[in-house]
Amino acid sequence: MRPTVYIETTIPSYYCDKRTTHINEIRRTREWWNSERDTYSCFVSQTVLEELIAGDYAGKDECLRLVEGISILSVTPEILDIAEVYQARRLMPRNPAADSVHLALASYYGMEYLLTWNCRHLANATKVRHLEHINRDLGLSIPILATPHMLQIVE
């Protein structure tokens, strides 16, 4: 069975990004997407789709096409409750609230990895122990928070 990956909004966003200010992240995202993605069972959520739709940026249609066919995880009342716990226990900020929802989705559905370029709120080593403590209290799995270059298979 392939490892599971929850793909957060920044991944398709960076894949489709045309700016030169994030060229390394864009390159690494495209490398992972084109070379590594098929070695994983990938998932997005309605939250990812809503964020992609709501944005005002060039390449929106390309981003939406990119995630077509990827399994969509449902945002349930339990997910929102978990996100609220993350906020109340100061693991995640209240704004943007979607960041805590992404983490709740990956935890609730037992994803092995949460793939993101959000290094401030998600792929941040300073949050790992806090996440482990909260998720153990809640009886949830603990996803590995990773960026695309951290999730490349090296032979």
Positions of PLM-derived features:
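General small-molecule cofactor/ligand-binding pocket signal
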Residues: 43, 73, 146
